[in-house]
Design a protein with these regions (language model features):
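Canonical alpha-helical transmembrane segment with a positive-inside/aromatic-interface signature
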Residues: 138-148, 168, 176, 180
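Membrane-embedded alpha-helical segments of integral membrane proteins
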Residues: 85-140
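Internal/C-terminal transmembrane anchor helices
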Residues: 144-171
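Membrane-anchoring hydrophobic segments
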Residues: 1-91
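Aromatic-anchored segments of alpha-helical transmembrane domains
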Residues: 27-32, 91-103, 158-164
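Hydrophobic, aromatic-rich alpha-helical transmembrane segments
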Residues: 52-61, 107-115, 146, 150, ...
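Soluble catalytic regions of membrane-associated enzymes that act on cell-envelope
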Residues: 169-315, 319-320
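Solvent-exposed soluble domains appended to multi-pass membrane proteins
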Residues: 266-407
Length: 407
């Protein structure tokens, strides 16, 4: 039975509206629930002063419903039903883009002039569409997904989705940090370590979060350098002089892991006797040193002190501390074995002043053989570019790779 012009118009408009609505709802919910949830949690925590908590499910559902209701309101006003129906979603996408770009501390930035300008351009496009659409003769086109009207509208939606992605914070490290903090806040160290584990991008804050998560699992000396590491000994804790900062997680979670909070440490003179130091003004090294004499402290500080020395490539400091905290046997964590073999090789079996001779009695044949393989790459691959590529492929994740590749 042939479809007359009136029935064709109603059926095709309905099909287009449903398809656009489904695509919009799927994209918006997925974007808010999976991609932006952690960033929104950080932003809401900062903007509310820590008084409110963002729930990814509730937040995604409510936001999606509100944005769709905004679309319905716009549609009721402008009544675009044909090839430009997708334009009725523009205000919703604009609001979604704004929400996705919000960070803490808050700043309007370019939105003060960009949002009014974009709305003005959108208004012009709507006016033009209402003038042009009545003249479009599409009654002979296929109905449904294969119609030109359908694909023109879907294309417009896709362009707006790409616009949302373009103005949102898509920085990988920012998302890694936010997700890691959310995971640690819920006591999930495994998830905090999983996020971004294959990426080479990091910063001081993400390194600090991974150090904390590994310490919780008792694997700090075993796995730290399997991740990219940046910063210095000052950045292993969010204290004085550190570039590493927490955005969402309360710092008390870290201090409870050590058993002693910085603010509870009594005033004490520094090593030169020239200043008095209050707990909240401690550097990471001063805080960790103070824990060694505190009966309430857990043993977590030991690995922190060792990896802090390794991060700074201070092998003498590492060698002095290692025998105090670990028995030199086969149970020594992987990175400590690697650092110890490296120290022995660099000192040619001659200890530096203060380093016990027992450090050179320890032998690990497998680690030593692997070190020899690493060391031979200088002669096997004389070209620096080729050597760098091969070394990264075969030895990334070892302390040796970190030690010799660190700027």
């Amino acid at each position: 039975m042939p479809i007359n012009g009136s029935n064709y118009k109603v059926q095709n408009c309905w099909t287009t509206r449903v398809a656009c609505a489904v695509l919009f709802l799927l994209f918006t919910f997925s974007w808010l629930y999976w991609f932006q949830a952690d960033m929104l949690a950080v932003a809401q925590h900062g903007l509310s002063g820590g008084k409110t908590h963002y729930d990814r499910t509730v937040g995604a559902v409510i936001s999606t419903v509100v944005l769709y209701l905004l679309h319905l309101l716009v549609y009721a006003i402008v009544r675009l039903t044909r090839r430009s129906h997708a334009l009725t979603y523009f205000p919703s996408f604009l609001l979604l883009a704004f929400v996705s770009s919000v960070s803490y501390p808050f700043s309007w930035g370019a939105w003060l002039w960009a949002a009014p300008l974009l709305l003005l351009l959108w208004g012009g496009a709507v006016w033009l569409a209402k003038k042009v659409d009545p003249f479009a003769n599409d009654t002979k086109e296929p109905i449904g997904l294969f119609s030109r009207r359908m694909w023109l509208n879907l294309l417009q939606l896709i362009v707006m989705m790409l616009g949302v992605a373009a103005v949102s914070d898509t920085n990988a490290v920012h998302h890694f940090k936010a997700h890691a903090e959310v995971a640690l806040q819920h006591g999930d160290a495994d998830e905090a370590l999983r996020v971004g584990e294959r990426s080479l991008e990091t910063d001081e804050s993400l390194t600090m979060l991974r150090i904390f998560a590994l310490s919780q699992k008792g694997e700090l000396g075993e796995r730290l350098f399997c991740y990219p590491v940046v910063g210095s000994h000052l950045d292993v804790l969010p204290l004085l002089g550190s570039k590493a900062q927490l955005q969402l997680m309360a710092d008390t979670v870290i201090w409870d892991h050590f058993g002693v909070r910085p603010d509870s440490i009594m005033e004490r003179a520094d090593s030169m006797g020239r200043a008095r130091i209050v707990g909240s003004q401690l550097t990471a090294s001063q805080y960790l040193d103070s824990l060694e004499c505190d009966t309430l402290a857990t043993l977590a500080y030991r690995d922190y002190k060792l990896v802090a020395s390794l991060i700074d490539r201070q092998l003498d400091s590492f060698a002095l501390q290692l025998p105090r905290y670990y028995a030199l046997n086969d149970s020594l964590p992987r990175h400590y074995r690697e650092a110890l073999v490296l120290y022995q090789q660099l000192h040619h079996d001659a200890p530096a002043p203060g380093v016990p001779d027992t450090l050179f009695i320890y032998k690990d044949s497998l680690t030593t053989l692997r070190w020899q393989d690493f060391h031979q790459y200088d002669s096997i691959y004389p070209r620096k570019s080729e050597r760098r590529i091969r070394t990264e492929k075969d030895f990334r994740g070892t302390y040796w790779y970190y030690y010799f590749s660190k700027d």
